[in-house]
A protein has these predicted regions:
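Conserved "landmark" site that anchors the functional core of diverse proteins
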Residues: 1-314
């Protein structure tokens, strides 16, 4: 069990998402950076899809009621176990009554707190993820707050302290063409890849809004019916400024879709900063389906290497 003493950010329970229900209008939800969540779980000898806490836009303070292995992945942060610094992509074991404090997220947006055995919350529609729009899943279907007691899956477990290779941060994101790609002007196809895009502050788990010097335009107006739009889809509304649909997106979209972020890059794209500093710049490039598959396979090899390292330290 962990007890949340203070909560300054937005935190909720997520696994890799809810699949197979979009035809009923039920969204995917799940971790914004699925690779980071899976890496943290494997570091703790959990199944990759074990539920963890996703935190953004602030920190928290919590205490453990028993010996509990834990780790952080995803965003980097300033964090302490009592008064000792702890670091992302390292495995630690907290003792009973120790306090874990995250003061701030320093690089990235989404921080994952994984614990041995995960968090014991009800499975709803084959997932532990919180659907914040619909108000179900996770812990009571809501954001976590001070005073919450979260049961954990393993009690009084001790694991040795080890680290794994962190996931790189990058603002160079790869795309594949989407269904209406050929309906955009040739200049727009070039602008998508050559123009510097900025992430707007009103971006969220539903979608990342982008702005650039020049807008994307169609060859001619389109009349479209809404159809399926998964995470990573880049829609272009009438103002010509793209919106990238993210984990909490609606199940369908009616704007023209110019491209889609490849699955391997979704987590890195999610970690790009929301401000007008140099760090908020994003650069896109179109890749082949073969390259998209190869990059996905590289992520799977990264997870396999974590399994090997953890197994070697048992």
């Amino acid at each position: 069990m962990i007890y949340i003493e203070k909560m300054y950010g937005f935190a909720h329970i997520q696994d890799i998402g809810r699949f197979g229900f979009r035809n009923f209008g039920i969204g995917h939800a799940g971790a914004m950076d699925s690779l980071a969540l899976q890496a943290g779980n494997l570091l703790l000898e959990n199944a990759p899809n074990t539920p963890a806490i996703e935190v953004t836009l602030g920190g928290f303070s919590l205490t453990f009621d028993c010996d509990t292995p834990f780790c952080f992945t995803g965003a980097l942060c300033e964090a302490y176990l009592d008064d000792q610094p702890v670091y992302a992509y390292w495995r630690y074991t907290a003792k009973a009554r120790q306090r874990l404090t995250v003061k701030q997220i320093t690089i990235g947006n989404y921080l994952y707190l994984c614990v041995a055995g995960g968090f014991r919350v009800p499975k709803v529609l084959d997932s532990y993820s919180t659907d914040l729009k619909a108000g179900f899943g996770g812990y009571q279907g809501r954001l976590l707050r001070a005073g919450d007691n979260l049961p954990t899956g393993k009690r009084d477990t001790v694991l040795s302290s080890i680290s794994i290779e962190p996931i790189d941060f990058t603002n160079k994101i790869h795309l594949i063409p989407s269904s209406e790609f050929e309906d955009f002007t040739e200049q727009s196809k070039l602008l998508l890849q050559q123009q510097t895009w900025r992430l707007e502050k009103n971006s969220s788990r539903m979608g990342y809004r982008l702005s650039g010097e020049k807008k994307l335009t169609l060859k001619q107006p389109l009349e479209m019916l809404s159809y399926a739009a998964p995470m990573g889809t880049i829609q272009v509304p009438p103002d010509g400024m793209p919106i990238v649909l993210m984990a909490d997106t609606q199940t369908t979209g009616g704007y023209p879709k110019i491209a889609c972020v490849i699955e391997a890059d979704l987590g890195q794209f999610a970690q790009c900063a929301f401000n007008h500093s140099k760090q908020s710049a994003v650069y896109f490039s179109i890749v082949s389906y073969q390259e998209a598959r190869e990059r996905y396979q590289q992520n799977q090899e990264y997870l396999t290497n974590i399994r090997r390292k953890v197994n070697a330290t048992r």
